[in-house]
Amino acid sequence: MEIYVKLILFFNVSDMDFLNETLLKNIKNSISEIVPKKKIGVAFSGGVDSTLVSKICSDMGFDVVLLTIGFPESHDILFSKEVNEFLKYSHHILEIDSKTFPTITSNIRNVINTDNLSLNENCIAFHYVSKLAKSLNLDTVITGNGIDELFCGYNAYREAFSGGEIRINEVMELKLDNELKMMKAVNVVASEFNVKILQPLLSAQFI
């Protein structure tokens, strides 16, 4: 939060308006460049990242289908329903079967061959997102991945703040590299269902 406060104090209102307009324009340009179809799924938790991407895609004329996965009564399922009461988009939910979950996770670990906890968790989640997309005849799914990496959404950025711009950029490059590697693994998992996972906020143009 400290870095955001300093940025807000540094810029005046007109500067912030310009930054907001430029950011929105760049997000739209990235979506237009990498998203080939008008009907798309959006991996949707109801959080800021997925809600932002969903709203922008809808405003751009895409036929948005929200895709939510989780265990029954999980936070993501409950919260996504609440948020979509305002968005009112097509919304589909896949509840994870706890009986088959261990087998699925074991299979995915064998495919991606890593002990990295975050990478495993995301690949497992996108296995189910891709399965849901496939059942709806969707082959393109958009995610909001990249917001935390690019806009200092991790505690590591607060810890790096005292090191100045150079240290913050070092942390950002590391976070982005990890995220890009993770999304490559995610697409390997999603390919089982012939689904492509796209990240407009991690495109080379946007970064």
Predicted segments, located by residue:
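N-terminal segments that mediate ammonia production and transfer
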Residues: 1-14
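ATP-dependent adenylate-handling active sites, centered on carboxylate activation for C-N bond formation
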Residues: 15-207
